Amino acid sequence: MSLEIVILAAGQGTRMRSALPKVLHPIAGDSMLGHVIHSARQLDPQRIHVVIGHGADVVRERLAADDLNFVLQDKQLGTGHATAQAVPFITADTVLILYGDVPLIEVETLQRLLKHVVPGQMGLLTVELDDPTGYGRIVRDADGKVAAIVEHKDASEAQRAITEGNTGILAVPANRLADWMSRLSNNNAQGEYYLTDVIEMAVSDGLTVATEQPHDPMEVQGANDRKQLSELERHYQLRAGRRLMAQGVTLRDPARFDVRGEVTVGRDVLIDINVILEGKVVIEDDVVIGPNCVIKDSTLRKGVVIKANSHIEGAVLGEGSDAGPFARLRPGTVLEARAHVGNFVELKNARMGEGAKAGHLTYLGDAEIGARTNIGAGTITCNYDGANKWKTVLGEDVFIGSNNSLVAPVDISAGATTAAGSTITQNVENSQLAVGRARQKNIDGWKRPEKIKKN
């Protein structure tokens, strides 16, 4: 069975009160539409058609990819009309129809739905709701078979009492879809072409409409305003937290934890409150992350400890290394095994060798730091001359005194020491002591300035 997927993403989203197209509003670091596309790709379709309308250029620019065919719906005349715009491009046997503002749909749910597309049958995803207000109702015949879907505004009182709602997600034979689209009518309360009308057509044509339901009704919840968007965000995060806990992670409070990307975790990981994981993050066994930390596009090897209020981006932390509290590791940073970065230390494009230490109040940029080297408090690598970046190289077992300025390019060789308060502008050879400061001068009889008295 070949598969193509149509994602309806043309709506304006007026209740969002935003210049941003509704489907581009974010959930967990990606747009709602981005989440739907991600799920669609896992079904291995031969093509994905995205029907766009309001903000079409912005949507196309944000999400352009080789496997996406963007189809323009000039006028928003309903879900049926939107689907019809994609029909001329479909060549597969089966079509799955999804929605760009329903981001939590699970791949496993869609796989179950697709199994119903066999000769003489199509699949419809429905949901049981305590309050189905606003949903189309699933009308069944005396034998319990689906007969039709009636939109809420067109439903009678008896039909509104039905609690089985339509999600709008369909899996249909492609050769039937074009015919059904040509037979749609806008003779309804909204004056729109409803995709749901194909259900009655399918029944009339002798097809069986087989139904599936999601395990969690939130899978099919859309977002029409920012309140609903926030509800989807929180549900996504709780679901992500449950998955991580099932893999061996302890979350101090799953309600105060966010995943905004793809996270791979080991066992016996401890994550404290208010931690945000962004992009692609790899966390190995026995890692501890303190409260109020942001980890983005980084790898934390076995036994790493990140202390409170640290920001880690584009970094690799080796086994048993630690950072923080209040550490900032910027892109290109590598801490080798058991390296230590303390409070108010910032690294950018810097490598710290095994067991190297920078305890506090330090900036290390464009630097190579050897094993067991110790960086004193207040040390700054002066790596930028206003036009170009230059590198600082420290060998193994170097001792940098407090309050040093290391003016790059400069090379301080193994075993060398620099005196506190030095400005180092020249290379230092093995085991040398470098003193780069003016000699202290004590002046006798010096008188402190006095305040000028005002009249």
Curated annotation (Swiss-Prot):
Q: Which InterPro entries match?
A: Bifunctional_GlmU, GlmU-like, GlmU_C_LbH, Hexapep, MobA-like_NTP_Trfase, Nucleotide-diphossugar_trans, Trimer_LpxA-like_sf
Q: Report the EC number(s), separated by commas if there are several.
A: 2.7.7.23, 2.3.1.157
Identify the metabolic or biological route this protein is part of: Nucleotide-sugar biosynthesis; UDP-N-acetyl-alpha-D-glucosamine biosynthesis; N-acetyl-alpha-D-glucosamine 1-phosphate from alpha-D-glucosamine 6-phosphate (route II): step 2/2; Nucleotide-sugar biosynthesis; UDP-N-acetyl-alpha-D-glucosamine biosynthesis; UDP-N-acetyl-alpha-D-glucosamine from N-acetyl-alpha-D-glucosamine 1-phosphate: step 1/1; Bacterial outer membrane biogenesis; LPS lipid A biosynthesis
User: What is the stated purpose of this protein?
Assistant: Catalyzes the last two sequential reactions in the de novo biosynthetic pathway for UDP-N-acetylglucosamine (UDP-GlcNAc). The C-terminal domain catalyzes the transfer of acetyl group from acetyl coenzyme A to glucosamine-1-phosphate (GlcN-1-P) to produce N-acetylglucosamine-1-phosphate (GlcNAc-1-P), which is converted into UDP-GlcNAc by the transfer of uridine 5-monophosphate (from uridine 5-triphosphate), a reaction catalyzed by the N-terminal domain.
- Domain of life of the organism in this record? Bacteria
Describe, as the record does, how this protein assembles with itself and its partners.
Homotrimer.
Q: Where in the cell is it found?
A: Cytoplasm
Provide the catalytic activity annotation: alpha-D-glucosamine 1-phosphate + acetyl-CoA = N-acetyl-alpha-D-glucosamine 1-phosphate + CoA + H(+); N-acetyl-alpha-D-glucosamine 1-phosphate + UTP + H(+) = UDP-N-acetyl-alpha-D-glucosamine + diphosphate
Name used for this protein in its record: Bifunctional protein GlmU
CDD domains named among the record's database cross-references: GT2_GlmU_N_bac, LbH_GlmU_C
GO MF entries: glucosamine-1-phosphate N-acetyltransferase activity; magnesium ion binding; UDP-N-acetylglucosamine diphosphorylase activity
Q: Where do the record's region annotations for Pyrophosphorylase lie?
A: 1-226
What are the alphabetically sorted keywords of the record?
Acyltransferase, Cell shape, Cell wall biogenesis/degradation, Cytoplasm, Magnesium, Metal-binding, Multifunctional enzyme, Nucleotidyltransferase, Peptidoglycan synthesis, Repeat, Transferase
Q: Which residues bind acetyl-CoA?
A: 377, 383-384, 402, 420, 437
Q: Which GO terms describe its biological process?
A: cell morphogenesis; cell wall organization; lipid A biosynthetic process; peptidoglycan biosynthetic process; regulation of cell shape; UDP-N-acetylglucosamine biosynthetic process
Q: Region annotation Linker: residue ranges? A: 227-247
Q: What is its main location?
A: cytoplasm
Q: Which gene encodes it?
A: glmU
Instruction: Write out the ranges of the annotated region (N-acetyltransferase).
Output: 248-455
What does the record give as cofactor? Mg(2+)
Q: Supply the enzyme class, top level.
A: transferase
Q: Does the keyword Protein biosynthesis apply?
A: no
Per UniProt, UDP-N-acetyl-alpha-D-glucosamine binds at 8-11, 22, 73, 78-79, 99-101, 136, 151, 166, 224, 330, 348, 363, 374
Q: Which residues form the active site?
A: 360
Q: How is the cofactor bound?
A: Binds 1 Mg(2+) ion per subunit.
